[in-house]
């Protein structure tokens, strides 16, 4: 690798939405004591350039955190977030709002999409109640119906109220709580865990097991869109189960980047996002090859490495990243070339 690298193309167009630099259009006030914020009233986004400029002189650890949280408008990210926002607009307007299945390997950006939506539509309290437009639950290994219900109720702050309730009564409590909180979408992370490892998994009529059966009935009762996110096996489950893909027909697959045009395009977008004084030529041949050898095209690993690179460079008061910064960051994090790197 060399410090002198070719300049990135200045004609490449890409938008960046910075989730950490958003402000309410009305300063956080709602229109009345009861009215929740609607999807078309999401937090206003500060321009990417202004957000980046705001942290250029920040301490090294703040600049590193900026890199971890920056939103990159890749095709898959835009498709997923726009679909979720469209689903939120359907809540309360139609009886079958639909849903979405987002799949990708670990670190591809599934949870980051959920974090971005949650940041755009945060909880909003009035004098008399609290609104929660986005409800979230994360499934663990072998999740049960109770795990799903209580996870959502706990997120909404209603867990104690329903702790002793069972069956249909608990489901009704959950549906009522979602309505009271003005919830417009339910985000389910690690949803691949609901695939049974054995037994009912062999039943072609019950591919998603007991929780899958319950989720269908719950959706039909609450009329709120559900977005499921999980590993690629979840996509296979939805493809095979007509009950699932007819209720939640949307599909977004998050890529793991291989060396090529899409990888270079991602690096160009990231280069413009980095809080450094000058371009870092991430898409130049030696840097792109090194970054892929360490990350194998995994977005989470890439952001982690670059955040440490920026931190190292900030300590050195450098205006751009050099070969020494890449190597030192890799050494500090023990992120070496992985098997399968090209």
Per-segment meaning from a language model:
Residues 62-81:
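Dynamic helix-loop-helix/coil hinge segments at AAA+ ATPase domain boundaries and subdomain interfaces
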Residues 39-44, 52-57, 81, 144-151, ...:
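Mid-core helix/loop region of P-loop NTP-binding domains shared across ATPases and GTPases
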Residues 119-130, 158:
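Post-Walker A helix-loop "phosphate-sensing" segment adjacent to the P-loop in P-loop NTPases
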Residues 94-115:
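Walker A/P-loop nucleotide-binding motif
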Residues 81-93:
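Pre-Walker A adenine-sensing motif
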Residues 2-55, 73, 107, 259-261, ...:
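C-terminal alpha-helical "lid" subdomain
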Residues 132-143:
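A short hydrophobic beta-strand->loop->alpha-helix junction that borders the nucleotide-binding pocket
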Residues 195, 204, 208-287, 339:
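The catalytic "switch" region of P-loop NTPases
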């Amino acid at each position: 690798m060399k410090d002198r690298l070719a300049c990135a193309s200045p004609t490449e167009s890409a938008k960046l939405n910075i989730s950490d630099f958003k402000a309410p259009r009305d300063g956080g006030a709602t229109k009345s004591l009861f009215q929740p914020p609607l999807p078309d009233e999401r937090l206003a986004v500060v321009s990417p350039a202004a957000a980046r400029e705001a942290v250029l002189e920040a301490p090294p650890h703040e600049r590193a955190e900026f890199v971890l949280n920056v939103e990159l408008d890749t095709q898959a990210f835009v498709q997923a977030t726009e679909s979720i926002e469209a689903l939120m607009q359907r809540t309360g307007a139609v009886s079958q709002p639909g849903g979405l299945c987002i799949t990708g390997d670990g670190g591809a950006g599934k949870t980051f999409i959920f974090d971005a939506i949650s940041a755009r539509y945060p909880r909003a309290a009035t004098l008399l109640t609290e609104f929660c437009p986005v409800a979230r639950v994360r499934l663990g290994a072998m999740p049960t119906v109770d795990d799903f219900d209580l996870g959502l109720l706990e997120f909404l702050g209603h867990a104690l109220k329903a702790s002793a309730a069972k069956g249909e009564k608990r489901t009704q409590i959950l549906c009522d709580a979602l309505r009271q909180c003005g919830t417009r979408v339910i985000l389910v992370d690690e949803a691949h865990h609901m695939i049974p490892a054995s037994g009912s998994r062999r039943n072609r009529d019950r591919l998603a097991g007991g929780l899958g059966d319950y989720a269908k009935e719950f959706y039909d009762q609450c009329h709120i869109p559900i977005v499921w996110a999980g590993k690629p096996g979840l996509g296979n489950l939805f493809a095979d189960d007509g009950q699932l893909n007819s209720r939640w027909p949307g599909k977004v697959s998050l890529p793991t980047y291989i060396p090529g045009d899409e990888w270079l395009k991602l690096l160009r977008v990231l280069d413009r996002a980095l809080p450094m004084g000058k371009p870092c030529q991430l898409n130049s041949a030696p840097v792109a090859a090194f970054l892929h050898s360490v990350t194998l095209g995994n977005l989470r690993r890439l952001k982690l490495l670059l955040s440490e690179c920026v931190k190292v460079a900030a300590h050195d008061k450098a205006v751009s990243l050099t070969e020494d910064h890449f190597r030192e960051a890799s050494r500090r994090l023990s992120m070496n070339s992985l098997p399968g790197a090209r």
